[in-house]
Amino acid sequence: MYYSSNIAGLQIVWRIAIMQWEERMMINCLFVGMGGFIGSVCRYLLGLLPIETSQGFPVKTLITNVIGAFVIGIIAAAAAKNTALNPKLVLFLKAGICGGFTTFSTFAYETGTMMEKGQTGLALLYVILSAILGVLAVFCGQLLVR
């Protein structure tokens, strides 16, 4: 008798723990989704700017990703500096807004398109600039907060 009631108690505790975890996950998903909506709309609006190059260089995607890297650097440094920041706010800003705003898939697509067109040098320049400027932007964002 004692053994079976102990197991039943553990099962109840386990179910409660799972329900609490699921609730936290759903709330986190809502924060990421709301931020993603904002970031995606901002990304779309930036894409409407009349910025073009004669050679088809994807300058708008580069600008978008560098801005996003700079902002995520600010957020990461602010979260590290101020541990009182709400983790859900950090999730909303980093995974949500920055994740929705920046785009690796577009970067990869544009690089592949340039290579298909025989613009290997331009594609290589784009990859190098994206990596270097992205890392520098994160670093500058972090320095701004420190």
Regions found by a protein language model. Give the residues of each.
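Membrane-interface helix-loop junctions in multi-pass transporters/channels
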Residues: 2-146
